[in-house]
Amino acid sequence: MDTRDILDILDLTLLDHDASEADLRRICDRANEHGPAAVCVFSEHVELVRGMLDDGISVAAVAGGFPVGGDDATSIRESIEDAVRSGADEIDCVLEPRDSDDFPGEQDLSLLEAMRQASSGRTLKVIIETPLLGEHAIRAVTRMVLATGADFVKSCTGMRGGCSDEDARLLSFEVKRHSVTMGEERGVKLSGGIRVREDVERLIEIVDSNEADISGPSRLRIGASSLLDDILR
């Protein structure tokens, strides 16, 4: 896999509430030079980043609580709406796992519906925190995420564990299943501990073995903060 192919699906990430304007300009300058799919930042940085980025590079805003997702639909909706007003093209939002036999249930459905409504017209990536879930829960949550209209299911924040090979297999299988059963093409975003080219190539090979059509920035993303240095070597 060549460097351009990786850049085309990369969400270059800087999630630091204390990031200075110089920090944000630095990541935007790198993005403008190398052309990733998106730059992913906290919602309070969206307006500044949008003004620094070239056209064609999306701004992805993390909204609604991170790394712990919010549990109030109104608060999540307002957070996402603020990010959209600031210029976000894409929204990354955590659906916080609950330690309950009814997870995912009606409460989680209401949160997902709020995320989708608030991000209408924008790309929505729902983070399900796979390191905290077993296989059954990963499958069930992914199906609910896709059924409520999210554009991508995203593995994890990376703050409570990383993206495993099994996560890539399960998420891509469920996205393929949704495409076959519902006729709707959705995407997978893999993030959490992805630092070197070999990580990307291995995970993409797993996705490709499930469904070769899950490719390109509209259906596959890699979220990483330090990967760029490695792939440019």
Language model: regions and residue ranges:
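Glycine-rich, proline-tolerant flexible connector loops at the mouths of alpha/beta enzymes
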Residues: 28-48, 64, 91-107, 156-164
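Hydrophobic faces of well-ordered beta-strands that scaffold small-molecule active sites
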Residues: 6-14, 39-41, 58-64, 91-93, ...
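Conserved, mostly hydrophobic/aromatic
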Residues: 11, 49, 83, 126, ...
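Active-site cofactor/substrate anionic-group-binding motifs, chiefly glycine-
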Residues: 36-90
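Catalytic cores of alpha/beta
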Residues: 71-82, 133-144, 168-172, 184-210
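Active-site mouth loops of central-metabolism enzymes
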Residues: 5-21, 60-77, 98-103, 125-137, ...
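Glycine-rich phosphate-binding active-site loops on the catalytic face of alpha/beta enzymes
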Residues: 61-67, 85-99, 147-164, 191-199, ...
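Alpha-helix-loop-beta-strand connector modules within alpha/beta enzyme cores
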Residues: 43, 47-66, 103-130, 143, ...
